[in-house]
Amino acid sequence: MVNTRKSSLRLLGSKSPGPGPGPGAGAEPGATGGSSHFISSRTRSSKTRAASCPAAKAGGSGGAGVTLDEARKVEVDGSLSDSHVSPPAKRTLKQPDSVCKDKSKSRSTGQREEWNLSTGQARLTSQPGATLPNGHSGLSLRSHPLRGEKKGDGDLSCINGDMEVRKSCRSRKNRFESVNQSLLFDQLVNSTAEAVLQEMDNINIRRNRRSGEVERLRMWTDTEFENMDMYSRVKRRRKSLRRNSYGIQNHHEVSTEGEEEESQEEDGDIEVEEAEGEENDRPYNLRQRKTVDRYQAPPIVPAHQKKRENTLFDIHRSPARRSHIRRKKHAIHSSDTTSSDEERFERRKSKSMARARNRCLPMNFRAEDLASGILRERVKVGASLADVDPMNIDKSVRFDSIGGLSHHIHALKEMVVFPLLYPEIFEKFKIQPPRGCLFYGPPGTGKTLVARALANECSQGDKKVAFFMRKGADCLSKWVGESERQLRLLFDQAYLMRPSIIFFDEIDGLAPVRSSRQDQIHSSIVSTLLALMDGLDNRGEIVVIGATNRLDSIDPALRRPGRFDREFLFNLPDQKARKHILQIHTRDWNPKLSDAFLGELAEKCVGYCGADIKALCTEAALIALRRRYPQIYASSHKLQLDVSSIVLSAQDFYHAMQNIVPASQRAVMSSGHALSPIIRPLLERSFNNILAVLQKVFPHAEISQSDKKEDIETLILEDSEDENALSIFETNCHSGSPKKQSSSAAIHKPYLHFTMSPYHQPTSYRPRLLLSGERGSGQTSHLAPALLHTLERFSVHRLDLPALYSVSAKTPEESCAQIFREARRTVPSIVYMPHIGDWWEAVSETVRATFLTLLQDIPSFSPIFLLSTSETMYSELPEEVKCIFRIQYEEVLYIQRPIEEDRRKFFQELILNQASMAPPRRKHAALCAMEVLPLALPSPPRQLSESEKSRMEDQEENTLRELRLFLRDVTKRLATDKRFNIFSKPVDIEEVSDYLEVIKEPMDLSTVITKIDKHNYLTAKDFLKDIDLICSNALEYNPDKDPGDKIIRHRACTLKDTAHAIIAAELDPEFNKLCEEIKEARIKRGLSVTSEQINPHSTGARKTETRVEEAFRHKQRNPMDVWHNSANKCAFRVRRKSRRRSQWGKGIIKKRKVNNLKKDEEDTKFADYENHTEDRKLLENGEFEVSTDCHEENGEETGDLSMTNDESSCDIMDLDQGQRLNNGAGTKENFASTEEESSNESLLVNSSSSLNPEQTSRKETFLKGNCLNGEASTDSFEGIPVLECQNGKLEVVSFCDSGDKCSSEQKILLEDQSKEKPETSTENHGDDLEKLEALECSNNEKLEPGSDVEVKDAELDKEGASKVKKYRKLILEQAKTTSLELVPEEPSEPVPPLIVDRERLKKLLDLLVDKSNNLAVDQLERLYSLLSQCIYRHRKDYDKSQLVEEMERTVHMFETFL
């Protein structure tokens, strides 16, 4: 688009008829430097002001194209400008001389100058007498001072002081520099509607006149206009429209507009500067529409009201409210420079880094640890980035809880503990302790366990070490550079809290091997980690520990001193380590396991890691539980168990080992295992020969077999010091060395000759051993694995055909080389090659050459033991194999067939002992019926220590303090609302005398605040109850008749809805739940709900006593009224009623009533006297009330029934055991149970006199012993049972909660079962069935009118029936299980005699030994299996004659097949 400003300016300048020096020259500065102030479309058509100088009026008449409307505006503006009023204090005046001078110059430009200004820029100063072509507003005759661009005339560049044209370029303090602006603002505010109407008229007039003005002003030539396409034409017109819409003088701007622009100026400064700098290139359509919409909704809301609404609770903001997302309010700066951007960025960066560092806090520190000592100045309390919560870490795991890893633990102490305890050692030698170590090994070997123990060890004592735990994926992020930033923050925080430890679990996922095929992100992370661990910056006292299962996957650059100084192999534990681990896991068992059993168990657990051994102990305990109490698997309720009767046996561990698959054997089976008990007598002699040869070939095996707690390092340290050792110090340093100086004769003796000394370590030259023999001699199946089991302390690398060809991604040569590399890295080690003859024939020549090359490359004295087996004779092996294993060096051991003595030991146990064993008899426990276990009582809560109680009370008090602050804010908000003034104070009784007669519980907001101060509210629910009470009182006292009453009712409902809405919107549900838990916990602990008692006049109901001490005091005072069968039962006491309930004993349910409010002490005493009299009358009628210090689990306190429906009563009415009724009705017992769901209705059921003494005693026994809920002060009597007898049948009705609370019928029946003798268990089972039939009896008859039995509610009847059905189903399940497993006792018959011909068995043994002379080991095993099957088939026979005959036939038949 072509800029036509200057061209049109020249045209206007040449046609200007008005006087004045240089109109054309004077218009150009005005076109580019005019003021840019504007007002919105709502006020653009308002009346303008005239010029303040007299010359302006004279110049206004000389304008060529001034319309009548504009002339009228000139007169109005002139009148406004005459009334000069001082502006606000912040709007300073400019010098009047320059103003007049500029106005005189602008006057000479006339209308042409005005049009040029309106089309030149977005926000321009309006010129005299012009009308904008867009029709939005008119221009005043008074010209604003111009910021002229000095291009030819110096006089035209005069500026009004330091007044700038552009809004973004001028000084903000000169923004409202006009005398008449405040007058215009006042006038526009008062005449908004008139301005809008005039605006619409001006739009229509100027829209019709726009095309004529364009032609008259010669904006474009005809050719140029016609050549433009429609798109360019429309766009050009829209830009002209947008420019002219802001071409209004600054002094016409509304002050509220300016203030609102100032509040948004920080967000819009950059856009305004760009838009005004580009002038014609950027439209303002969106901004125009937004401004128009803002001023169309009257009235204008003041800014301070909006601010007050958003910051209602900013003074005492607590976590009880949700955090609302608030709009950031930018500050208004007077500086127009951007020099503070860098400083602002640095401040934001520092705050962001501080917040991120605070999230990287150690996992072994708690809030109290960080708030104490020097750590208080280092960090602030925050959350850890690791997925390990400090509360979830087992604090009991210490170094003494780890078995078999003493070497690793000592190394960790050298790295972490010793630099703190003995810094003088490191200072003396000027050394730094190792700062990095790498844990690697199979899964479950204790890598993470050692890290946990280290974290707990670092948390002890005065010098605590910060422990940071990260997994490999914790630092990864999808954002570019975020992973590196997290690593840098982690090391930064660790450096601030030094000494510290960073543990990277599964570090292979964080720092894999870098390669060309790898993603660049991982390469960057690895590079960052390398630089952080050992870069230019000193890492300081930061120990880095990494753990991985795949050592080869870690980048090799990490595996060097300075980064990971040490590498610890966590191999599978050997027998000694396994025994230690078993001792650790079973040290708290009672009774403890014997040392001999643990040793044998450790020997059997070959290939088990630490996690497997722990799982073995757990599985064995569960099997013992399953064997002792199988009933618990058939019931979903907790049953009473005798834990002391659960005793583990060796059989439990055996079955557990059958169920567990070791982690190391899930993918690859272990190569070594001990000789089985069956095969040991047969191959024990051969195995001992192998061990003897092994000591010669591979002397390092002695270290593995020794039970002493020593290794090579300890052998060196315990060795006697060589007195003849040479000094390693300089000759002049006599005082520093205790050694004698070297003589001239011994100069050439090497200093480091310890490796050649046989006193320090065993020496072996290429240790190799080949077990050769006939096929089936047991060298591969039994002897070699047993030998590897003996050497299990060494790492074993299996080199067989599956190891070469199982991985398709590797070639056999590569797999072979990999195995040798691993063997050389973990010396001393073993390379195991089973079936070497078959292996040599199967592999290719390349693999053979690779194997021989790698074997020869092993150093001569390197302790790498090559163990091989061959199923062929040594003479039949290939020559290359014979060259590897030499007979003359005792590297070949020939396995011979078992001799006669070995075979006799092998078959002796089977023939003489197993075949002559009597048949097994059923155990006495199996013959008896399964024991029906009673339901268990809920266990009492754990007793807290004094410190825990105090800490918990402090936390609860802090939470309740936040709740009170929130409730005060809500109450203040309601009280200060004018609509709710009538509820802010109590009702004046003098004005409304009958108020207390209608309203029994008055409530107002001032009383609510008082209750808040007295700590009466533990939850927001209690607060809302009083708000609802205010509403209900207003609705009850003010009928819906008069208009005034209707207003009060409307405001009461509004008060209720407002309070509920505020609570629902601003109260955090988690915080509310926490308050509910606090209230429930305090009720369970026996504490009163409120810390201060409410005044007597505020309640009209009886007070509730909930103190446990008072309950026990009443228990001692009235021993006959206490049920004392269990230590966990509720404490009952006979108490005096506080209000009249005389008609309750007659079985009549009436609407609950409350006493009137008492205003003084005398009325209260009088009511107490009446209640006491009422109690005496009740006692005379055979009734009294038993009150319990029990509360329901829903958290409501037992108290006033008239307050809320959520409060329930635990009152129980019963007859004293020593009292009898005089009316001959027999024993009378009344029970009252009030529940939340029944709206405070009591249930009184009277048992008939037809109950026999046995049933009565059972019921009394239940009342004494089975009122249990797990705690002494928290029992709820919702489930009080009621026994009814209708038509001679017994019916049990109860109301039991669910879950842990058991029904009363269960307790009655199970208690009867526990009292009966065990020998009559079958008869008791029949009694239970009769009781179940009694339970099925329903009460179908109507009650007599004069009876004392209360009619039950329909809902309660259904609930009671459902509970009875539930219990009946439980009893039937146990009865069904019992009947299934019940074995009828067989009549006692004499045990038949055992017939065994032992002499015949001995002959069979001799025959068997003779016939198996030439049999191999595998053939002997097959014969043993056949004989074992014969014994199993005849295991129930008392006459073993047929067994012996079948065994003889088996021996002869086996010999025939051979």
UniProtKB/Swiss-Prot annotation:
Annotated stretches, region: Disordered: 1-155, 244-286, 321-353, 1189-1208, 1217-1257, 1309-1330
Residue ranges of coiled coil: 943-974
GO biological process annotation, one example: nucleosome disassembly
Phosphoserine: modified positions: 16, 79, 81, 86, 140, 318, 939, 1338, 1347
Biased composition (Acidic residues): 256-279
Biased composition (Polar residues): 116-129
Biased segments, Basic and acidic residues type: 99-115
CDD domains given in the database record: Bromo_AAA, RecA-like_Yta7-like
Keywords tagged on the record: ATP-binding, Bromodomain, Coiled coil, Nucleotide-binding, Nucleus, Phosphoprotein
Biased composition (Low complexity): 34-58, 1240-1252
Domain of life the protein comes from: Eukaryota
Annotated ATP binding sites: 441-448
InterPro entries attached to this UniProt entry: AAA+_ATPase, AAA_lid_3, ATAD2-like, ATPase_AAA_core, ATPase_AAA_CS, Bromodomain, Bromodomain-like_sf, Bromodomain_CS
Family: Belongs to the AAA ATPase family.
Protein name as catalogued: ATPase family AAA domain-containing protein 2B
